[in-house]
């Protein structure tokens, strides 16, 4: 999910639930304590959000998301033409949980 308004604090959070749990029971969902994807000034990625998942032609899991390449928003933050579609390969840990990293290429 996306959270924290529209500026550099905009980020992606994650909810998870055990595989055999009742997905309709909101008490069983677990919210990650920290964002799984956030601004990375070093790489010039600001306010990532609105993600979805797909596979590339080689069968690798890929996350598609948008982010800005500038820290400052000019004009209306809800109509900002500086958001760009970006891709990230998603890797998985031993427990089957996604590992999100700008280093995943």
Regions found by a protein language model. Give the residues of each.
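Carbohydrate-active catalytic/glycan-binding domains of CAZyme proteins
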Residues: 1-105
């Amino acid at each position: 999910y996306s959270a924290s308004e529209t500026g550099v604090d905009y980020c992606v959070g994650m909810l998870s639930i055990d595989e055999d749990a009742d997905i309709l029971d909101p008490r069983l969902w677990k919210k990650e304590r920290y964002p799984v994807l956030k601004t990375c000034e070093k790489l010039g990625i600001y306010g990532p959000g609105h993600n979805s998942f797909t596979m590339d032609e080689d069968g690798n899991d890929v996350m598609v998301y948008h982010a800005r390449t500038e820290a400052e928003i000019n004009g209306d933050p809800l109509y900002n033409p500086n958001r760009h579609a970006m891709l990230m390969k998603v890797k998985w840990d031993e427990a089957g949980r996604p590992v999100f990293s700008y280093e995943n290429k």
